[in-house]
A protein has these predicted regions:
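Catalytic cores of the polymerase beta-like nucleotidyltransferase superfamily
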Residues: 1-438
């Protein structure tokens, strides 16, 4: 069992007492810190959000204490000073389809144990009071110690969103060797087979996918969804990559789906940028529609993938920043991989395509995606990627060509742009020659 921090732990308990002191001394409020804040503290992980459950109170009592009501479907209140969410203890009963098909019951007689029972995983069903005492009726501490993600009760199957949440927690805690309990994975598969995932809104799918991108292992989110069958429902474009072969000469892992997971892992190692991690996961979607008669070759995937990415982003409502980077990586990653063969004019065309003159940070993002693609191959994870340096040198050389010098030489109108392109190509050629000879 994991050790519990004492009441002298100022990073966790001390500031909670300060919050209590900001309320009337005789308020009698029974509130407990719950969920991720307790879980992450027990795992020695930084936690930035704190949620509270309040037992034995009514909405009127909360408002009398200065809390502001914000909940629509059930009573949630914001603390008058910290603005942290406080929810009245409640129970839930399945009344319809999807993750919103629940009837909530809240009243002063709902116990802490009853409230914790409605939560998804045992490690999220631990509460702590203002004295530092832990309440763990569903043995979440043991599962923390055993590194297991386990459902609290059979009611787990009633909420399809939990499939994505468990996959995200698996990605978040994979570096600590957490695994999904077999019986919980069975329940996730049961949810998939029930058809309940179809009731998830695009916003909720993207919300969980987006959160998974910020975890240490985003690829685990996809692999867990694949294992329980959910990937084919919520992200069929990625699911279609599994079982599609690639040339073994370039891809010892062969399977495009496995390659995608490896690229996702490498992208997370190379960059904290969520758009970069997203683009890495979807850059090869075109391979999923290559006719079997052409396997294992995928000559058109850089082109066919564009339409798929656009439709995916529209369906799941992916932000434009993510979509735009993904489209550029999809279209141009093969060109970047061939940097050792490109002419100076082709380098320039690619740089212009990226609009690096107005968006200089974009080049590094794209190159990191391509580096992740290069490293995301079985046995080749540590292979050098000189293509990145070649494009960086080409960009810096072209950047030195100044318009004012061209104007000073007498060029006007559209001739300025044409001369700039010529000089940039020449500068790139010279810079790459120097790089080759160094």
């Amino acid at each position: 069992m994991l050790a519990v921090k004492s009441s002298s732990d100022k990073t966790f308990r001390g500031d909670k007492l300060q919050i209590y002191d900001s309320l009337p001394k005789d308020n009698g409020l029974q509130r407990y810190l719950v969920g991720g804040a307790v879980r992450d503290k027990l795992l020695n992980i930084d936690s930035y959000d704190r949620d509270w459950v309040v037992v034995g109170s009514t909405p009127q009592q909360m408002e009398n204490l200065g809390f502001t009501a914000v909940g629509k479907d059930f009573p949630v209140f914001l603390h008058p000073k910290t603005k942290e969410e406080h929810a009245l203890a409640r129970t839930e009963r399945k009344s319809g389809s999807g993750y919103t098909g629940f009837e909530c019951y809240f009243a002063p007689d709902v116990s802490l144990e009853e409230d914790l029972m409605r939560r998804d995983l045992t490690i999220n069903a631990i509460a702590q009071d203002d004295k530092g005492q832990l309440y763990d009726p569903y043995h979440g501490q043991k599962d923390l110690s055993d590194r297991v993600l386990r459902h609290v009760s059979d009611a787990f199957v009633e909420d399809p969103l939990r499939v994505l949440r468990v996959a995200r927690f698996a990605a978040k805690l994979h570096h600590l060797n957490f695994t999904v309990a077999p019986e919980t994975m069975d329940m996730m598969s049961e949810i998939v087979q029930s058809g309940e995932l179809a009731h998830l809104t695009a916003e909720r799918v993207w919300q969980e996918w987006h959160k998974s991108l910020s975890t240490p292992h985003p690829e685990v989110f996809l692999s867990i969804l694949k294992e329980c069958g959910a990937l084919a429902v919520v992200l069929p474009e990625i699911d279609a990559l599994f079982g599609v072969p690639q040339p073994e000469k370039w891809h010892p892992e062969i399977d495009t789906g496995i390659h995608t997971l490896m690229v996702a892992q490498q992208a997370a190692l190379l960059s904290p940028s969520l758009p970069v991690r997203f683009a890495a996961q979807v850059h090869d979607l075109g391979k999923g529609v290559t006719p079997e008669s052409e396997w294992p070759s995928h000559k058109m995937h850089c082109h066919t993938g564009l339409k798929i990415i656009k439709k995916l982003c529209e369906r799941v409502r992916v932000p434009n920043e993510f979509r735009d980077l993904a489209l550029l990586v999809c279209e141009q990653h093969s060109n970047i991989h061939r940097a050792g063969e490109l002419k100076p004019t082709t380098f320039l065309k690619v740089l212009n395509k990226f609009d690096v003159w107005r968006k200089p940070d974009r080049l590094d993002d794209i190159l990191l995606c391509c580096q992740a693609d290069h490293a995301g191959r079985k046995g080749l994870e540590d292979q050098p990627y000189p293509q990145k340096a070649r494009f960086e040198v080409a960009y810096q050389a072209a950047l030195q060509v100044e318009v004012k010098a061209i104007i000073a030489d007498g060029f006007q109108g559209k001739d300025i742009r044409e001369e700039q392109e010529k000089r940039r190509a020449i500068a790139i050629e010279h810079a790459l020659s120097e790089l080759a000879s160094s």
